[in-house]
């Protein structure tokens, strides 16, 4: 028998005035996976997540979390999820232990159980030495780890992570990635929104690409890369080379649209087979297009995103009124 999906959403719509921030998005997240939602700022990622987390009403469409209807039974859904975002929602005047104890109490745990959960999470997230320090003394990475720990106080089976590594340095981002992988190993399901292509590539088993409120592609990282070609020819055009002629040659020989950076003269060409690279280079030579370097690599998610949307993932999409980051513990938690 097929297991109930962790998230099953169809035709999600959210409108703010004249802006259709989420425009008919479908999402299907399997139990036990990391599912990535990738898109630029303002694409609608956070708005979609907030609807799934019961933080925003759904204007049209439907969604279920482990089979529970998000609109009809929001209280039950909140018992199944944890949520954390790019802005830590912990109280700076309290210590790490006090913050976690408070979240446990808000979730209905008895005082002793909340304290035990706090100690367990401090150990799990390597924060024991800082347990009695006020949060004001924490680094950004420590705050983010504590915020994630708070979302796990009642061991929810589904975690929503809204751009959890935004603003972190590379080392701390790597540590957060390890923590997220550990959550899945321990049995959690993770829905991760991100604008970082490498983050989606590193973590997610499957990815939905969101642009201007719509889902424009979905698949595993390898499937998405294969959709724009099996290989990428990377060419550095020599200074003074005719860039327009080079693009025409690529279109004629490879039947593909090159991605050119005019300022640097760097051109990426998606290829259906690596053998096609030789044909393109011969065409350049016969036409007098000079190059200084060349390589053939697997396509990147950046090239996938550009091919699908016509712009990079670091570009701003339409304004997303809910896209200022999720810091949702206070809203999701209910005093019981």
State what each model feature region is.
Residues 177-271:
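ABC transporter nucleotide-binding domain
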Residues 14, 27, 235-237, 269, ...:
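Preference for bulky hydrophobic residues occupying beta-strand positions
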